[in-house]
Amino acid sequence: MERLQKQPLTSPGSVSPSRDSSVPGSPSSIVAKMDNQVLGYKDLAAIPKDKAILDIERPDLMIYEPHFTYSLLEHVELPRSRERSLSPKSTSPPPSPEVWADSRSPGIISQASAPRTTGTPRTSLPHFHHPETSRPDSNIYKKPPIYKQRESVGGSPQTKHLIEDLIIESSKFPAAQPPDPNQPAKIETDYWPCPPSLAVVETEWRKRKASRRGAEEEEEEEDDDSGEEMKALRERQREELSKVTSNLGKMILKEEMEKSLPIRRKTRSLPDRTPFHTSLHQGTSKSSSLPAYGRTTLSRLQSTEFSPSGSETGSPGLQNGEGQRGRMDRGNSLPCVLEQKIYPYEMLVVTNKGRTKLPPGVDRMRLERHLSAEDFSRVFAMSPEEFGKLALWKRNELKKKASLF
């Protein structure tokens, strides 16, 4: 009892350490006062956890401080007790014993402790978000769903049925939006809306093309109707030009009249210039009328390398460069228009001693093509057809031996 008399009075539910213990802060020196009973450490530990001993929600997070105790006023304000238990220890010096003795008494607040609690309230920086509760509509979780809000606004059964029908109809479309009636319909699947099929796209394209054709025909009819207006404008131009005497005035008036004329966009009357409509015989007949450039009386033997098809070699009219327009060189995408000249072998030989001057217009990479059939068979000991069937490295080796590479 003496031990308890030495200790100051504490509020119910508070823990205070004993100062008489030989080992300060040991568990055996801790006593608690609860319901007008003094409990030791062992009795305090035997009480079940679900009973609020210290009137704190999380007693396991409370930090044990042997020199300070919590008063009842601090336990009343739950957010402050949470901040104090979860925040680190403050570095401010402890208050005087008189202030603590006055603050520990239940229901009595001294003048020394009053300014501490009322005048300078304890504030700490918030480390969490406080939602705005000034407006009742700010919290979206407390609001009813949209269709229920509409029911509260207009609670008639007709509007309720309309809203339900709208919800059901919108659930049938992707993104709850009806499709555009002007666009082709998409393929409907159970997984994801696919793009429209090619058949639907093709029909839509044909419809648009037909409408464009109709618009073009209308424009052509308008152009035909405006032909008379064009004639009238030209007659006016001639009359105005006949009135002007100076040449400079005539030029200026002519330019102004040409700018004022409407531009005709009729292009269907133009002939087709595509290569699919021109024939090979028409091109050869035109080329035969041109003056012969470098033609010789020697007849070249057409090989598979120099001609795209073997049918040209059998026809006599395609020899001697007449069918060169249709010939395709190997490795080139464009046809060889100009006929290659034929030179003797001695003029085409390339030596390493000095820089040899080749004839003009000679292809340095294909000197063998400028040889005649007799010189070709004499130099390479084979026909041009057999030479064209060889591999590239083999042909280069033969040309090196013949000094044509």
UniProtKB/Swiss-Prot annotation:
Localized where? Cytoplasm; Cytoplasm, Cytosol; Cytoplasm, Perinuclear region; Cytoplasm, Cytoskeleton
Region (Disordered) residue ranges read 1-30, 79-158, 173-192, 203-332
Biased amino acid composition, Acidic residues: 216-227
Single GO term (MF): actin binding
Comp. bias regions, Basic and acidic residues: 228-242, 252-261
What biological function has been recorded for the protein in this entry? Answer: Membrane-cytoskeleton-associated protein with F-actin-binding activity that induces F-actin bundles formation and stabilization. Its F-actin-bundling activity is reversibly regulated upon its phosphorylation by the cAMP-dependent protein kinase A (PKA). Binds to the erythrocyte membrane glucose transporter-1 SLC2A1/GLUT1, and hence stabilizes and attaches the spectrin-actin network to the erythrocytic plasma membrane. Plays a role in maintaining the functional integrity of PKA-activated erythrocyte shape and the membrane mechanical properties.
Q: How does it assemble?
A: Monomeric (isoform 2); under reducing conditions. Self-associates. Exists under oxidizing condition as a trimer of two isoforms 2 and isoform 1 linked by disulfide bonds. Found in a complex with DMTN, F-actin and spectrin. Found in a complex with ADD2, DMTN and SLC2A1. Interacts with F-actin, ITPKB, RASGRF2 and spectrin. Isoform 2 interacts with SLC2A1 (via C-terminus cytoplasmic region). Isoform 1 and isoform 2 interact (phosphorylated form) with plasmodium berghei 14-3-3 protein; the interaction occurs in a PKA-dependent manner.
User: What is the official name of this protein in its record?
Assistant: Dematin
